[in-house]
UniProtKB/Swiss-Prot annotation:
Its EC number is 2.1.1.107, 1.3.1.76, 4.99.1.4. The modification Phosphoserine is found at residue 128. NAD(+) binds at residues 22-23, 43-44. PROSITE patterns: SUMT_1, SUMT_2. In the N-terminal section; belongs to the precorrin-2 dehydrogenase / sirohydrochlorin ferrochelatase family. The gene is cysG. This is Siroheme synthase.
Length: 457
């Protein structure tokens, strides 16, 4: 270990930055956030330093480097574009046994600055020891995505509860289970973020007073259309906290690889016209696992409230009194159209979008006359097997046969395939494609040749 990671208490302690440019400003922000009593020495300063000085947040000393400024300092940073000057600052600090950071020169410094994830009071620091700052930044960004934005507020609030929790729960095991429950409670985190004192109190009392083997909860998460990079930040956090993940066929392997390793995985895949697991049985799986006190994630492709039957599943939970929440996902219409270069709306071609299920029930009829109108985009989910019927009905009700159409297979995935043509060809085109596929009909499809960015990658 080349460096010892430490967290310094700098509040109301003298610190010095030598340099008045953009790099120095970034370092100054960190020291000001830490509460340091900051002096900045430079020949000239960018406007931000002047603004801080005018607000009484720091002291500016204009002129050449003055070593005496180090005499009362706890910490110094050399942040100029003059290597020789930076070396002088470092040596002067070393002579006074003051830790000094030299920007972009770790070998000349007595301490280095890590990449920081700030969820105060929770702080995470990542460093490559100065050997690969880009790697440290990438790791920081990955960790940022895993830590909820309001985690710091929850951590601070937890500190206020420590005494009461110690009184309430006799054993260390009980306390640990309580804290695990508190830190993953979305309602508490949101209430703290909104400063909703009533909700904070209600949630806290519920968490403290309910038995530790209480019923669990279900989180309905939209996995997006396929590309794992389109999974939302909150969705990622939920699947990495789950005890059980109940998922279907439209959830990609790449997304399942992000699921918490020791979580139970229950596959309930569905295909058009054939349900591998009946919907009622899926409802009962969610109910049964939650009643065991587990944190259950129901992971569905796209958005769970857009042709995902998410509402039906939640009704069962609601009737049983099981707590639940919903994390929306990018729906297939949005993802597939974007990755195919087809804007769903356009000032010249489409003022509205219609999302339509292609599962046409026996005896059920869509409003084909309105669907055939111009200046709109139609998106049919699960419509591959009904493509010929869709073609026939739209033409019968007045849609021009030359209306552009596209079918997107495995949208947003590396295996995405897109075929386009006209409405008169729709039934024939559908025979060349496999499920899952999305049908897009409208003048906007004509923009695909110009805007098709994904296939070029």
């Amino acid at each position: 270990m080349d460096h010892l990671p430490i967290f310094c208490q700098l509040r109301d302690r003298d610190c010095l930055i030598v340099g008045g440019g953009d790099v120095a400003e970034r370092k100054a922000r960190l020291l000001l956030d830490a509460g340091a009593r900051l002096t900045v020495n430079a020949l000239a300063f960018i406007p931000q330093f002047t603004a801080w000085a005018d607000a009484g947040m720091l002291t500016l000393v204009e002129g050449p480097f003055d070593e005496s400024l180090l005499d009362t300092c706890w910490l110094a940073i050399a942040a100029t574009d003059d290597d020789a000057l930076n070396q002088r600052v470092s040596e002067a600090a070393e002579a006074r046994r003051i830790f000094c950071n030299v920007v972009d020169a770790p070998k000349a410094a007595s301490f280095i600055m890590p990449s920081i994830i700030d969820r105060s009071p929770l702080m995470v620091a990542v460093s490559s020891g100065g050997t690969s700052p880009v790697l440290a930044r990438l790791l920081r960004e990955k960790l940022e995505s895993l830590l909820p934005l309001h985690l710091g507020q929850v951590a601070k609030y937890a500190g206020q509860l420590r005494g009461r929790v110690k009184q309430q729960f006799a054993t260390m095991s009980e306390r640990r289970r309580f804290w695990e429950k508190l830190f993953v409670n979305d309602r508490l985190a949101q209430s703290l973020a909104n400063n909703d004192q009533k909700a904070i109190t209600e949630t806290t009392e519920q968490l403290i007073n309910e038995p530790l083997d209480h019923r669990g909860e279900v989180v309905l998460v939209g996995a997006g259309p396929g590309d794992a990079g389109l999974l939302t930040l909150k969705g990622l956090q939920q699947i990495q906290q789950a005890d059980v993940v109940v998922y279907d066929r439209l959830v990609s392997d790449d997304i399942m690889n992000l699921v918490r390793r020791d979580a139970d995985r229950v596959f309930v895949g569905k295909r058009a016209g054939y349900h591998c697991v009946p919907q009622e049985e899926i409802n009962q799986i969610l109910l049964r696992e939650a009643q065991k006190g587990k944190r259950v994630v129901r992971l569905k492709g796209g958005d769970p409230f857009i042709f995902g039957r998410g509402g039906e599943e939640l009704e069962t939970l609601c009737n049983a009194g099981i707590p639940f929440s919903v994390v929306p996902g990018i729906t297939a219409a949005s993802g597939c159209s974007a990755y195919s270069g087809i804007p769903l709306t356009h000032r010249d071609y489409a003022q509205s979008v219609r999302l339509i299920t292609g599962h046409l029930k026996t005896g059920g009829e869509l409003d084909w006359e309105n669907l055939a109108a111009e200046k709109q985009t139609l998106v049919f989910y699960m419509g591959l097997n009904q493509a010929a019927t869709i073609q026939q009905k739209l033409i019968e009700h007045g849609m021009p046969g030359e209306m552009p159409v596209a079918i997107v297979e495995n949208g947003t995935a590396v295996t995405q395939r897109v075929i386009d043509g006209t409405l008169t060809q729709l039934g024939e085109l559908a025979q060349q494609m496999n499920s899952p596929s999305l049908i897009i009909i409208g003048r906007v499809v004509g923009l695909r040749d110009k805007l098709n960015w994904f296939s070029n990658h």
